[in-house]
A protein has these predicted regions:
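N-terminal Rossmann-like dinucleotide-binding module
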Residues: 1-47
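Charged/polar, solvent-exposed surface patches and flexible loops
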Residues: 41-45, 58, 109
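Beta-loop-alpha module in the N-terminal Rossmann-like domain of NAD(P)-dependent dehydrogenases
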Residues: 50-108
Length: 109
């Protein structure tokens, strides 16, 4: 059974994770989200079966999505992690998990 996931951020790291997820065959990449139009266009070409979006909230609102991959900039991760927790999603995230040590401790707490 594949794990249904939504990816947020399709820059260099998001593409790397996408590629490895594709290779593993264990993931159903349901969504790819990026605010950059060029990144969304690339995602459309590479992953035609994924829904390509610019609003990450769609991923958090979709109850069928089991996990979220957070590969956007670190300054957005604290809020994204909090949304994922509230949405009962498993979290895969690039490091660091936040852009300041104080925000990292807030996440841990």
């Amino acid at each position: 059974m594949k794990i249904k996931v939504g990816l947020i951020g399709f820059g260099r790291m998001g593409q790397m994770y996408w590629e490895e997820m594709q290779k593993s065959g264990r993931w159903d990449i349901a969504y790819i989200c990026d605010t950059d139009p060029a990144s969304r266009e690339l995602a459309r070409n590479l992953s035609p079966s994924s829904r390509i979006i610019s609003d990450e909230q769609e991923i958090f609102d979709d109850q069928s999505v089991e996990a979220v991959g957070l590969f956007a900039l670190a300054n957005s991760r604290k809020e994204q992690i909090e949304k994922a927790v509230r949405s009962n999603k498993h979290i895969l995230t690039e490091k660091p998990i936040a852009d300041t040590i104080d925000k990292e401790w807030e996440i841990v707490d």
